[in-house]
């Protein structure tokens, strides 16, 4: 439990064949959790005469119960209400985010933003030079050329190609997700280079993209059948818009347009196709920005769009958090083989 997301950090290359042997020989049964909580993992293992049980609920590192041979070693109560994000996140608005990005002392954010630029750029480069997954980043560059818009999609996708398919390079995350951290940052970095933006402009734009992504994710929760890349792609569009000189009006419309375009995308787990979904999400964010630059926008009443950026964000959050619960259940049933497609 103390290792959190690094429980596999000490696995060596020599041990990998042993893992393959174990997986091919062990009896592993998977079933759907009976809890209504969208994030519940219960694992029970047997070895010789010993048994162990671990339960994680609500978030990726929240271990609430540990048992060994029937003895309870940890029992921590959990409720969905207690797992709500802090008030500081729930009170965010797009307008406040932009004001903060304009005024923040960069020394207060320099360390994490600098790491995000360094680490996320490095793994994107690995995805573009190595052979990982479906190679979506490489395919985008080979197929659609070297425009800044295509490079923004390709670099974000390439980072996911590597991340989802075994690359051990670190990533600076957003909302608990490496994919969302790369999606929110890499397009902004690519555009900053193209526009020859100063370091200060890049850092402030990344503050916008990261905080908009967090704002969009806050109402959805840590896990949903709604693809989190959609939120990060809208955040990236907001950050790029900021680089072009956009402020509240332009960024608010960019976010609304992006959410209207891409909010139907499903999450069906972390795997190679995430890279293609990221490319789609970045495309939606950039198109949302270009729409407003060309005096075009979606209006309240256009499908799920509600007048006002905060109202649209709340509407999308409601769909993702509550409306897609049964979608999540159906996806899980299909993935674990409880239901077959007829």
Where are these regions (language model features)?
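Acidic-glycine-rich active-site phosphate/pyrophosphate-binding loop
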Residues: 147-166, 198-216, 256-264
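Conserved phosphate/anionic-ligand binding catalytic regions in large, soluble enzymes, centered on
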Residues: 1, 169-186, 227-231
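Glycine/charged-rich beta-loop-alpha catalytic/anionic-binding loops adjacent to active sites
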Residues: 162-173, 213-223, 267-271
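Signature of multi-pass transmembrane helix bundles
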Residues: 20-166, 333, 337-342
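Helix-loop-helix junctions within the multi-pass membrane cores of secondary transporters/permeases
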Residues: 198-220, 225-243, 249-251
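Contiguous domain-boundary segments centered on the initiation and propagation of an alpha-helix
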Residues: 3-46, 194-200, 206, 210-213
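Functionally critical mobile loop/hinge segments
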Residues: 3-10, 17-18, 37, 45, ...
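Alpha-helical support elements that line or immediately flank enzyme active sites
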Residues: 1, 181-198, 237-245
